[in-house]
Structure formats: structure tokens, C-alpha cells
């Protein structure tokens, strides 16, 4: 994560302070140079004539106060120059700090631009993925609808098959019941036939003997649709 750079307002204030300090330093240097030139010109001025060479009625001018004033001004100019030098050094330090801050701002701006480009690329990729996911969701929705329709149809077919199986089971049970009833009837007829045969054997052989008709006897295995095999009579 990039560290936040200095505030732009503070950078501009420091830059304005630096410019003002440079201007004041130049003005003070100019004032000091003027004072220095004035003092030098005063020192180079010709000496006053000797008192004996001057007219007794003319009083020599007293230049001591002017020299003291010039010295005072020179000292003030030197002090101002020192102050301006200090301010100039401080302004140079502020300038270096501003340059470092501006460089940090440029680096931060470059990093932010790089991150912005990366974010734009990610946004474009996210849009593409969103479109693809929308298409996939549409396909999945259609597949789900088809699956639900197939499941409903399969459920209906299963219910119909269960109904048919129940009907077939009921029909099978009814068929088994009919088969059992027919077998019992067959067994009864066979028992009756056996009894008739025994009675015919015990009768005398004279006279004609009529055979009992067994045309009403059902054939074994005549019932169709029942799966149980016929039971052999004991």
C-alpha cells in the first residue's frame, strides 16, 4: 500500500515561503552592498587639512558622528546579512524538502495511475466474467426447467406404472383365487369319478354297462394367466 504524500496546500505554502525568503535575502544583500560601498567610499575620502593650514575663521567639520552612523549601519547590514543567510539556508532546506515532497507526490501519482489501470483491467475482466456467468446462469436455468419437466414426466410414468402393477397384482390374486377354486372343483370331480369307478367294478357284469360321462371335467391347466403350476392330486 503506497504511503500518502504531503498535502498539496502545504507544498504550495512552503514554495511561496521559499520564494519570499529568496527575495528578502536578495534585498538584504543589496542593502548590505550599498552600505558597504558607502563605508568604503567614506574611508577612501581625502583627509581633512591640518588645522594650521586652514583659515582660522573656518571650523573643520566634525565627521565622527557620520562615521559612527555608517559603522552602525554596516553592523546592522552585517546582522541583516547573517539573518538573510540563515533564512536563505532555511529556504534551501525548505526547497529540498519541497523537492522531496514533489518527488514523493509524483511517485505516488505514478503508483496511483498504475493501480488505476490495474483496477480498470480488473473491472473489464469482471464485466466479461459477469456476462459469462449470466449466460451460464441462463443455460443452467433452462437445464433446470428441462430437468423439472423430465422429473414430472418420470413421476407421472412411475405413478402409472405403480397403478398398473397394483392392478396386475390384484388381477393375479383374483386369478390365483379362481385357480384354487377350479382345482378344488377338479379334485371333487376326480373323487366323484373314482367313487363311480369303484361302484362300477363292484356291479355284476350282466347287462350293458354305461360309462359315466366326464365331458364336464375341465382340463388341467386350462386357466390362463395364472402362473402357479397345477398341484398333483395325492
From Swiss-Prot:
Query: According to the UniProt entry, which residue ranges have a biased composition of type Basic residues?
Result: 203-219
Q: Which residues form a coiled coil?
A: 67-171
Say which domain of life the source belongs to.
Answer: Eukaryota
User: What's in the keyword line of the UniProt record?
Assistant: Coiled coil, Signal
Q: Quick one: signal sequence residues?
A: 1-43
| Region annotation (Disordered) ranges | 44-63, 194-234
What's the protein here called? Coiled-coil domain-containing protein 194
Q: Which organism is it from?
A: Mus musculus
**Upper classification of the organism:** Eukaryota, Metazoa, Chordata, Craniata, Vertebrata
Gene behind the chain: Ccdc194
Amino acid at each position: 500500500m503506497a504511503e500518502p504524500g504531503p498535502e498539496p496546500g502545504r507544498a504550495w505554502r512552503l514554495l511561496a515561503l521559499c520564494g519570499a525568503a529568496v527575495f528578502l535575502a536578495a534585498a538584504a544583500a543589496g542593502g548590505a552592498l550599498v552600505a558597504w560601498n558607502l563605508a568604503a567610499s567614506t574611508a577612501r575620502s581625502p583627509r581633512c587639512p591640518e588645522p594650521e593650514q586652514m583659515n582660522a575663521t573656518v571650523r573643520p567639520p566634525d565627521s565622527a558622528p557620520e562615521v559612527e552612523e555608517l559603522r552602525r549601519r554596516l553592523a546592522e547590514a552585517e546582522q541583516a546579512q547573517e539573518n538573510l543567510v540563515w533564512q536563505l539556508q532555511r529556504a534551501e532546506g525548505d526547497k529540498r524538502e519541497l523537492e522531496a515532497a514533489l518527488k514523493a507526490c509524483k511517485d505516488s501519482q505514478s503508483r496511483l495511475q498504475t493501480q488505476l489501470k490495474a483496477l480498470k483491467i480488473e473491472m473489464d475482466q469482471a464485466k466479461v466474467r459477469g456476462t459469462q456467468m449470466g449466460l451460464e446462469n441462463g443455460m443452467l436455468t433452462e437445464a433446470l426447467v428441462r430437468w423439472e419437466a423430465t422429473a414430472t414426466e418420470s413421476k407421472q410414468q412411475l405413478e402409472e406404472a405403480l397403478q398398473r402393477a397394483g392392478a396386475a397384482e390384484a388381477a393375479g390374486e383374483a386369478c390365483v383365487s379362481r385357480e384354487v377354486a377350479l382345482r378344488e372343483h377338479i379334485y371333487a370331480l376326480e373323487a366323484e369319478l373314482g367313487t363311480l369307478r369303484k361302484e362300477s367294478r363292484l356291479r355284476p357284469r350282466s347287462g350293458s354297462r354305461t360309462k359315466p360321462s366326464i365331458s364336464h371335467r375341465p382340463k388341467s391347466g386350462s386357466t390362463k394367466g395364472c402362473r402357479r403350476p397345477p398341484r398333483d392330486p395325492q
